[in-house]
UniProtKB/Swiss-Prot annotation:
Keywords tagged on the record: ATP-binding, Cell membrane, Ion transport, Membrane, Nucleotide-binding, Potassium, Potassium transport, Transmembrane, Transmembrane helix, Transport
Keyword Transmembrane among UniProt keywords: yes
InterPro entries reported in the protein's UniProt record: KdpC
Listed PANTHER family: POTASSIUM-TRANSPORTING ATPASE C CHAIN, POTASSIUM-TRANSPORTING ATPASE KDPC SUBUNIT
NCBIfam families membership: kdpC, PRK00315.1, PRK13997.1
Gene Ontology MF terms in the entry: ATP binding; P-type potassium transmembrane transporter activity
Keyword hit for Transport: yes
Localization of this protein: Cell membrane
Protein name: Potassium-transporting ATPase KdpC subunit
HAMAP family: KdpC
Length: 193
């Protein structure tokens, strides 16, 4: 009996020690460093309106249904963060073809002046997470005609808006040139005032 206690005692102490270190101390240290070094990122990269209310995060896409605004990528989860993910069908899967065809049909209804051959792939396909906040500058540009007609904002101003909101690759190395749809639509909203 005494031998069992002598074996169990260090096991319990080590378990408790690592539980405290890994479950409490380490997360608090990392959170503290993140808050000190990059507070905006640590808090979720939130975007606020004029009344200081959170309206979204620049890291999570939103569904913009009003045709006066720029549309983001297709999302099979309707931008619900708790259901993050996509079906990720193989290119040979007929369900992928159906999903893309449906996206193209919806696109044609909203943007009849843009030939389907000019629609960038990111506007008719899902991302891996279903939450992408960004689109390519070309995906934003092909929507200018529709938005200009509906808002009476000149195309030149809308193209400049896209240019102003375009971000390059992170550190000039990672990712692609992109436009954050939420930030772009907030800038567009300012033009509509």
């Amino acid at each position: 009996m005494e031998k069992k206690q002598s074996i169990l005692s260090p096991i319990i102490r080590i378990t408790f020690t690592f539980l405290v270190l890994c479950g409490l101390v380490y997360p608090l240290i990392v959170t503290g460093i993140a808050q000190a070094v990059m507070k905006d990122n640590a808090d979720g990269s939130l975007i606020y309106n004029d009344k200081n209310e959170v309206i979204g995060s620049k890291l999570i896409g939103q569904n913009f249904t009003d045709p006066r605004y720029f549309q983001g990528r297709v999302s099979s989860i309707e931008y619900k963060a708790e259901a993050s993910g996509s079906n990720n069908y193989a290119p040979s899967n007929p369900d992928l073809e159906k999903r893309v065809e449906k996206s193209i049909e919806e696109w044609k209804k909203q943007n009849p002046s843009v030939p389907v051959t000019e629609v960038p792939i990111d506007l008719v396909t899902n991302s891996g997470s279903g939450l992408d906040p960004d689109i390519s500058p070309k995906a934003a540009s092909v929507q200018v005609d529709r938005i200009s007609k509906l808002t009476d904002i000149p195309k030149e101003k809308l193209n400049q808006l896209i240019k102003d909101q375009t971000e390059g690759a992170a550190l000039g190395l990672f990712g692609e040139t992109r436009v954050n749809v939420l930030k772009l639509n907030l800038a567009l909203q300012e033009l509509m005032k």
